[in-house]
């Protein structure tokens, strides 16, 4: 009746179920391990972030101190060596103004990097400490919850196992009862078969036909038939009972199967996701705020620095020789102001304070005047030429000294490799052959300019 | 004839002139001193600028090295402790991405500050060296030219002095000759007066009336008159000659006066200005370029840093729990993927794989179903309540962890005094009472959230 090729044996079914449950149990363990690992990584990351910002705070503080020292060194120098009025005087000159702003900028940057360091230590790191605490606490709680969920799931799986086994048992009982019933039926059949052989063949082979047999035989047969009937009835009852139990057990198994699948689905699809959500509760948002604090600090530093650079740029734009000359001359007014005109001093009450241009000096003066006029017009022509040469020479010098060679953007365009920065950068200003050539040209032109000036009475 | 109250004496005039020339000479000396001082200050300023940038280059290099070490420390850690695949896996998580970008940023800043240092050393400082050389050379030449101009001016002043003295001399000679002439005229007059007394009173008192006197007396008188006449003629001639000389001398003096005043004017108004221009030739322009190189370097650094911060900001914006959860589950797919559904395992070829819901189990199942439905509707109502509570609690936590408390602009707003930065800044994050309160609230809410979840089966 049982065909091994067709039906799985109980053992096989149990073994399969065991395997399936073992796999799930292994997964559950791995899930916990995975959460542990994520927790560990998160704790490590937050520790790294703290260490990173602690170390960076030190670096920023170091940088700030060095910048402050640098500024103080030159500010002290300016304050000590010269008296205050002199210093104040010099400040009106545009290059000195640039220099002062440079020093101010260094002071400003020093201060800003101290602030940055302070924000790292007193704001950003505490945030990471908090995130770390929160994460640890949430992971712990989530793991507890997760463990409970897993235990519940395992309970469901065990229940399914037990329900399945019950079903097997009751079904086996039912099958057994059925086979026993069938056996009884067979025996009854056999008994009836005997009666038919020993008696008339007319009699149909039914228990009711026993009325026709002989009394004695009849009695024996009747008692035997009754026995079998009784047994059959018993077995029938047993079978019916077992069959019902098996049906109920199967129903329980089927219901437990649905419930287990639903539980497994709920655990894998919802609970695990919720569990990770609980571990993450606020993590990303808090990390976001900590990093935004960092960004806010950096951007404020940048803005402050930029403001300083703007001030310097403005001062550089105002570098102006003409106004500096004006300021210098005003500053040393007594040194540069022209003296009183020399007045005619009449000798012993000499009344004539005008040039006497009458005879006999008239002709001589006229001649002299003509000579001077002729000399003057020659000089004027010469002068025009010299002026043109000088202007052209000056323009050449101006062109040389105002060439726009100050853009260093190239130096900040690195190759993707991030390597060999030095070699790229060092090729800048001085090593360019064009610079040397330009400088030679500048000095030559300058020399020429001076020569021309000197030759023609400045 | 000379009235001391009315005319200045020669000595006074000479003394006044001397004083005036001395004053000019003192001014000229001061002018040279002033140029020297400006040259010295300029050389000093350029030296200071070189020292400043040399020292700043060191500071930037130091800063760069420290940043590099910082980045390497954590990058090495990430590389060594875990295998590459694992690291790669983790990189898909948004917090790890932020962390990697932070380290990248430090590397980028390290590189940029090296570049900055390099530009200081190899571009900006050489520029200042050049400007210093140029300035020194130009000052030297300008001073030579200035000295020549001053010598020329002194020559003109000396000439004026000598011309003035000549005028004084010739005018004195002229006056003397005139007075001698006048004396002769007086004598002649006297002689004629004698003749008139000794002779007729009719005769007019003229030299021609001598014809009427006695021969002897006539002869004596005539010879005396002739003598006087001769002397007078001589004196007349002398006077005329001296007068002409005096006029010429005065003319020379007046011309020299004009020339001197013009020279002085030219020197004070044009030459001094030109001299300063020559000292400044290219100075402001070259300084401008050197400082613009500095600005270009700083602005490029700023831009590069800003790009890095933008990348970090973008990563911070992309901090997302949901997608991280998704990625984690994909990463550990074998751990998180739901197992196969549990299938009905028929026992010994049991053909019924469906719930048997006929008599005699029907009524029992129906009863059970009704019980479950009633329980389910109770749970649904409860669930709705719990869900609402949980959502509200979660929202509270979300509100706490997403509060926008990351703006640190205030820390960069210093008081004008630039002092007491520390005290202002340290009042930030942790010391605020609101933070402690908020944290307590957060943990309480979190606890409540977990309790609710646990009570109602997660």
UniProtKB/Swiss-Prot annotation, chains A, B:
PANTHER family noted in UniProt: SLIT-ROBO RHO GTPASE ACTIVATING PROTEIN
Gene Ontology CC terms: cytoplasm; glutamatergic synapse
Functional note: May regulate cell migration and differentiation through interaction with and inhibition of SRGAP2. In contrast to SRGAP2C, it is not able to induce long-lasting changes in synaptic density throughout adulthood.
InterPro entries given in the database record: AH/BAR_dom_sf, F_BAR, FCH_dom, SLIT-ROBO_RhoGAP
Keywords: Coiled coil, Neurogenesis
Name assigned to this protein: SLIT-ROBO Rho GTPase-activating protein 2B
Residues annotated as domain F-BAR: 22-324
Designated gene of the protein: SRGAP2B
Organism: Homo sapiens (Human)
SMART domains (UniProt xref): FCH
């Amino acid at each position: 009746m049982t065909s091994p090729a067709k039906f799985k044996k109980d053992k096989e079914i149990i073994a399969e179920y065991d395997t399936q449950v073992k796999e799930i149990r292994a997964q559950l363990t791995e899930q916990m391990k995975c959460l542990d690992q994520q927790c560990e990584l998160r704790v490590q990351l937050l520790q790294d972030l703290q260490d990173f910002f602690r170390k960076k705070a030190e670096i920023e503080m170091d940088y700030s101190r060095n910048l402050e020292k640098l500024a103080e060194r030159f500010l002290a120098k300016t304050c000590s060596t010269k008296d205050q009025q002199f210093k104040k005087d010099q400040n009106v000159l545009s290059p000195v103004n640039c220099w002062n702003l440079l020093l101010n900028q260094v002071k400003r940057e020093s201060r800003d990097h101290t602030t940055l360091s302070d924000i790292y230590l007193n704001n950003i790191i505490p945030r990471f400490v908090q995130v770390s605490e929160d994460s640890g606490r949430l992971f712990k709680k989530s793991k507890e919850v997760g463990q409970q969920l897993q235990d519940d799931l395992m309970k469901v799986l065990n229940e399914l196992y037990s329900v399945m086994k019950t079903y097997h048992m009751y079904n086996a009982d039912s099958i057994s009862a059925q086979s026993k019933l069938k056996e009884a039926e067979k025996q009854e059949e056999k008994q009836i078969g005997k009666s038919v052989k020993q008696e008339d063949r007319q009699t149909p082979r039914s228990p009711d036909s026993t009325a026709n047999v002989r009394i004695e035989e009849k009695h024996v047969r009747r008692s035997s038939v009754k026995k079998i009937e009784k047994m059959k009835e018993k077995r029938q009852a047993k079978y019916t009972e077992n069959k019902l139990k098996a049906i109920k057990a199967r129903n329980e198994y089927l219901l437990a199967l649905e419930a287990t699948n639903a539980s497994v689905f709920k655990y894998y699809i919802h609970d695990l996701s919720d569990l990770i959500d609980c571990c993450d509760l606020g993590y990303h948002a808090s990390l976001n705020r900590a990093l935004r604090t960092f960004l806010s600090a950096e951007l404020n530093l940048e803005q402050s620095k930029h403001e300083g650079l703007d001030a310097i740029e403005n001062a550089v734009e105002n570098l102006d020789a003409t106004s500096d000359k004006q300021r210098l001359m005003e500053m040393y007014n007594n040194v540069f102001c022209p003296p009183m005109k020399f007045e005619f001093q009449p000798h012993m009450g000499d009344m004539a304070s005008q040039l006497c241009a009458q005879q006999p000096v008239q002709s001589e003066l006229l001649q002299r005047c003509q000579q001077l006029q002729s000399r003057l017009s020659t000089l004027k022509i010469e002068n025009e030429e010299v002026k043109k040469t000088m202007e052209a020479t000056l323009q050449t010098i101006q062109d040389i000294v105002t060439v726009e060679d100050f853009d260093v953007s190239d130096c900040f365009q690195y190759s993707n490799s991030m390597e060999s920065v030095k070699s790229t950068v060092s090729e800048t200003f001085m090593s360019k052959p064009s610079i040397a050539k330009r400088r030679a040209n500048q000095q030559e032109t300058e020399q020429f300019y001076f020569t021309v000036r000197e030759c023609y009475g400045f």
